[in-house]
């Protein structure tokens, strides 16, 4: 998951198009052979249209109820403006929020409550350092 924060506008959240239609932090699953950083860049672009640089790891959430682990990374977009949404299949809306909406995902609620303040100048990590072994 990506924590993308604009000092004036708040934190970037995406609203799911289907299911419970919850507000969530951008992110998704890592494909086999894909690094964490590449997966997050791909997911953020697919969901928001933004290109981002990935910074430091901010938090970890063990989702044992879903057999998953959520990792939260700082991310800095190449542009503050959000591109159009005509090609997004899974996401209905993308917008910055100063407070957490009522219909937020469990992961968004957890990371929002655990935040310590705005993320500034987070160091980047190499994309090649976190890869699955070849199958």
Describe the residue ranges of each PLM region.
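Conserved positions in beta-strands of structured domains
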Residues: 5, 55-59, 78
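Short strand-connecting beta-turns/loops that link adjacent beta-strands
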Residues: 7-9, 18-19, 65-66
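Nudix hydrolase/Nudix homology domain
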Residues: 20-23, 89-135
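Active-site-adjacent beta-strand/loop module that shapes the phosphate/pyrophosphate-binding cleft
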Residues: 61-84, 95-96, 100, 110, ...
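Vicinal oxygen chelate
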Residues: 55, 83-91
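Short, acidic/hydrophobic/Gly-rich beta-strand patch recurrent on exposed beta strands
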Residues: 13-16, 74
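Conserved N-terminal beta-strand and adjoining loop/helix that marks the start
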Residues: 1-11, 29
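The catalytic Nudix box helix
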Residues: 25-57, 73
């Amino acid at each position: 998951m990506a924590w993308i924060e604009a000092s004036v506008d708040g934190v970037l959240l995406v609203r799911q198009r289907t299911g419970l239609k919850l507000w969530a932090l951008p992110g998704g699953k890592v494909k086999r052979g894909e690094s964490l950083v590449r997966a997050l860049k791909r997911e953020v672009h697919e969901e928001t249209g933004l290109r981002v640089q990935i910074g430091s790891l901010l938090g970890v959430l063990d989702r044992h109820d879903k057999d998953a682990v959520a990792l939260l990374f700082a991310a800095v977009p190449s542009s503050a403006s959000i591109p159009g949404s005509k090609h997004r299949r899974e996401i209905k809306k993308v917008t910055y929020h100063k407070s957490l909406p009522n219909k937020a995902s469990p992961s968004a609620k957890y990371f929002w409550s655990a935040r310590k303040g705005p993320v500034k100048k987070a160091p980047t990590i190499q994309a090649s350092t976190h890869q699955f072994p070849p199958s």
